[in-house]
Amino acid sequence: MLRSEKPVAVGDVVNIYKESPSIIITRYHGLTVSQVSSLRESLKSREAGFKVVKNTLAKIAAKQTGLDSIANLFAGPTAIVYSKEPVEMAKLVVNFAKSNGNLKIVGGIVDNRVLDEYSIKELSKLPSLNELRGKIVWLLQAPSTKVVGVLQAPSVSMARVLQAHASKN
């Protein structure tokens, strides 16, 4: 990389750090081009990204954005995965890492909190924001459905009693 290109590259990483509340730092040593392309496509469909970064430039960008605490995570062939939705991204990366042993999760940052590999794996087990919204809607609708059922039960029972009485006569 030319010296004149480095400030632009640092700027790109700074923008990712500023615009993405969730970042996972990975080691991609041993992944094939097709595997990286597959991961990128999967991430892109979920409005996330995968960027191979030069460690020194990623460290400079981290210091410029006040994320000094993640600078020590950059060593070896490193790539960052970034997204606005942390759970979906974590699920995708953890599942990809399980199926492709050459992708290693090193750590990350979610809402300015540094996470280790274990924390990211635990994050991937949580329900996504959309799943939580669906559960809340279901919980709000469930009582009303039960109330309707309870209110209808006496009239149905009364109708059965009357029908039974009418059939006897």
Swiss-Prot record:
GO terms for biological process: translation. It holds the Pfam family Ribosomal_L10. It comes from the Bacteria. Keywords: Ribonucleoprotein, Ribosomal protein, RNA-binding, rRNA-binding. One of its GO terms (cellular component) is large ribosomal subunit. GO terms for molecular function: large ribosomal subunit rRNA binding; structural constituent of ribosome. Belongs to the universal ribosomal protein uL10 family. Forms part of the ribosomal stalk, playing a central role in the interaction of the ribosome with GTP-bound translation factors. Part of the ribosomal stalk of the 50S ribosomal subunit. The N-terminus interacts with L11 and the large rRNA to form the base of the stalk. The C-terminus forms an elongated spine to which L12 dimers bind in a sequential fashion forming a multimeric L10(L12)X complex. HAMAP family: Ribosomal_uL10 (MF_00362). This is Large ribosomal subunit protein uL10. It comes from Rickettsia akari (strain Hartford). The gene is rplJ.
